[in-house]
Design a protein with these regions (language model features):
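Conserved AdoMet
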Residues: 1-67
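Conserved class I S-adenosyl-L-methionine
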Residues: 61-79, 98-100
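Extended basic-aromatic, gly/pro-enriched interface segments that bind polyanionic ligands
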Residues: 69, 90-174, 178-186, 211-213
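Conserved SAM-binding loop of SAM-dependent methyltransferases across substrates and taxa
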Residues: 73-92
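Core SAM-dependent methyltransferase catalytic element
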Residues: 172, 213-230
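A short glycine-rich, Lys/Arg-flanked "PGG" loop and its adjoining helix->strand segment in the class I
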Residues: 188-200
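Conserved beta-strand signature within the Rossmann-like core of class I S-adenosyl-L-methionine
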Residues: 200-208
Length: 230
């Protein structure tokens, strides 16, 4: 659709010219943004039933560091924020619960910061959450995330191929349905970088269609798509 006779010709053009905006455009076209709130909800159940009780007991500084890596259009980090709000209730103000959300795609981050979603994105939410955490976005069938949930998420551009140099280590890293694009070697080195950026006792959650090689990963396998740093 961009005036090239074939995909190969397009790739050759990208390699020859190496203009960042061309690459950005390609990434935005290639990376899937099919996502919705509470996607793969068994992860969120585990997060609520197992991970949060553990963190609330052990994090004496009351800082929860959670990273949504490859956050696409924002449903995942906003879902995490809603769960934190539900779980902590009136204690929420006593904790720093800000979620770091990163993506390589500027378009995705723009959509995420804009935080406007349609009815189908919200269909998996528990009863009452829509009225509690969303407002009408002005047009019929469109909703926007409430300011308290929005302000709990920090969006940053980040390429997962780069060294991880954030100030904090993480208690939980969500990197779901992102590594399907990577070959084994790339995946292994990314998982090692994640491991080094995880607090002891912290968790890595990946997509349900993904798995890590139990022999080569430093994380301990807990259950499908759920790993822990011992």
């Amino acid at each position: 659709s961009m005036g090239f006779p074939s995909f190969q010709a397009y790739v050759d053009h990208l390699i020859r010219n190496q203009k960042p905006e061309d690459l950005e455009l390609m990434l935005n076209k290639l990376t899937t943004n099919y996502t919705y709130f509470m996607r793969e909800e068994s992860h969120f159940e585990f997060f609520t039933d197992v991970i949060l009780p553990y963190l609330l007991q052990t994090k004496k500084d009351r800082v929860l560091s959670i990273w949504s890596a490859g956050c696409a259009s924002g449903e995942e980090p906003y879902t995490i924020s809603m769960i934190l709000k539900e779980y902590l209730g009136s204690k929420a103000s006593m904790w720093d619960t800000r979620v770091l959300a990163t993506d390589i795609s500027q378009n995705a981050l723009k959509a995420a910061a804009n935080a406007v979603y349609d009815e189908t994105s919200l269909r998996n939410l528990p009863a009452g959450w829509k009225s509690k955490y969303f407002r009408s976005a002005g047009s019929p069938g469109l909703y926007t995330v409430s300011p308290e949930i929005k302000s709990n998420v920090i969006f940053r551009t980040f390429n997962l191929m780069d060294p991880i140099r954030f100030r904090l280590k993480f208690d939980v890293i969500f990197c779901r349905n992102v590594m399907i694009y990577f070959d084994q070697e790339t995946k292994n080195s990314l998982v090692n970088r994640f491991y080094n950026a995880t607090n002891p006792g912290g968790y890595l959650l990946i997509g349900h269609s993904e798995s890590l090689n139990k022999e080569s990963t430093p994380y301990k396998y807990l259950r499908p798509a759920t790993y822990r740093k011992e």
